[in-house]
Amino acid sequence: MKNAIHPEYKEITATCSCGNIVTVGSTAGKNLTLDICGECHPFYTGTQRVVDTGGRIEKFKNRFGALGKK
C-alpha cells in the first residue's frame, strides 16, 4: 500500500432507534443513527407477519377463470 493516500479508518458508533449501540469501522468518521437493526428487525426477532394473499388469488380466479376454459 502507498503511504499517505488512503483515508483514515476509525471506529464509530452506530446507534439504532431501539437503543442498540454497535461499534463499527468506517472511513466517514461520523457516528451513525439507524432506523432499524438486527436486534429490532422483524425478520431477526421472529415477529414477522405473513401476508395473506389468498383473497387476492380467489378474486383473480373469479374475474379471469372463465377465460382459460374452452
Swiss-Prot record:
PROSITE patterns to which the protein is assigned, alphabetical: RIBOSOMAL_L31
Coiled coil regions in record: none
Alphabetically ordered keywords of this record: Metal-binding, Ribonucleoprotein, Ribosomal protein, RNA-binding, rRNA-binding, Zinc
Record's cofactor remark: Binds 1 zinc ion per subunit.
One of the record's GO molecular function terms: metal ion binding
GO biological process: translation
One GO cellular component term noted in the UniProt record for this chain: ribosome
InterPro entries assigned to the protein according to its UniProt record, in alphabetical order: Ribosomal_bL28/bL31-like_sf (IPR034704), Ribosomal_bL31 (IPR002150), Ribosomal_bL31_A (IPR027491), Ribosomal_bL31_sf (IPR042105)
Any Pfam family the entry gives: Ribosomal_L31
Presence of the UniProt keyword Ribonucleoprotein in the record: yes
Amino-acid positions noted as binding Zn(2+) in the UniProt annotation, renumbered to this chain: 16, 18, 37, 40
Names of required cofactors: Zn(2+)
Its biological purpose: Binds the 23S rRNA.
Complexes and interactors: Part of the 50S ribosomal subunit.
Family (UniProt): Belongs to the bacterial ribosomal protein bL31 family. Type A subfamily.
Record protein name field: Large ribosomal subunit protein bL31
Organism: Psychromonas ingrahamii (strain DSM 17664 / CCUG 51855 / 37)
Gene name per UniProt: rpmE
